[in-house]
Amino acid sequence: MTDKKIIVQFTMLTFFIAFLVSGALIALGPFGYSVHNWVHTFQQFMMNIPFAIYILSPAIASYIVLKKNKKVANFMEWLKTVFYVKNSLFPYLFVVAGLALYFAIHIAVSGRTEMALPFYTLLLSLPGNLIIGGLEEAGWMYILQPKLSKKNGFVLSSIFTGIIWTAWHIPLFFIPGTNHGEGLINFWMFAVQVMAFRFFYGAIYTISGKGRVFMCVLFHTMFNAASPIFGTTTMTWAGTITANAAMVLVSIVTVVMYDKKHES
């Protein structure tokens, strides 16, 4: 009952924060509000703050709900779990391999090898993508998907979380200045990727021990930082289906092998 209560509280609070803030930003669009992917002025930085609150809604809800239900004593305890980096080398290699596999398949299928941005921009954008992107997993993978997995198993919990995550992303396609809102990202391709990636996050969580939440945060951060570098390379249906099918397959095989190893 406690897990179910926490899931419901977390999901409701996440969507309340997300849709309240994003709704306000959409309403302010005609009056000049816009998100800025690259910040050059203090004004642009300030305009990104409310957008960051929307994106951080799963993390905000995670702490509030866990604190309310006495699952964490204070913010520092919550933060230590989210940023527990003392892991074995294998989960780090798995995260990097997942990124390499995804983008390599897209490049192979699309036949495009040019980069839209220099590779060093990945490093420059990591801090921003930690806040606007990576820390979502402090909610999705600290509370929602793991607790759903306890009752429903790996596959169904990945699907259920993917559906919720897709719905949570919908306002992005209406907020001025986002790649989604500017038409640079196809909603249905994005939905396929979102659903597939929940399987990969589930696999990361399964193999990563005490640092499981951080490893999911790391993958999300690195993926968001890497995506702009490849530009439209990832925007083909052939690549979308092939790359995401591969991610799902790798995830399922990884979890099955892990479970068999730890049962024996």
Regions found by a protein language model. Name each.
Residues 183-245:
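Functionally important transmembrane alpha-helices
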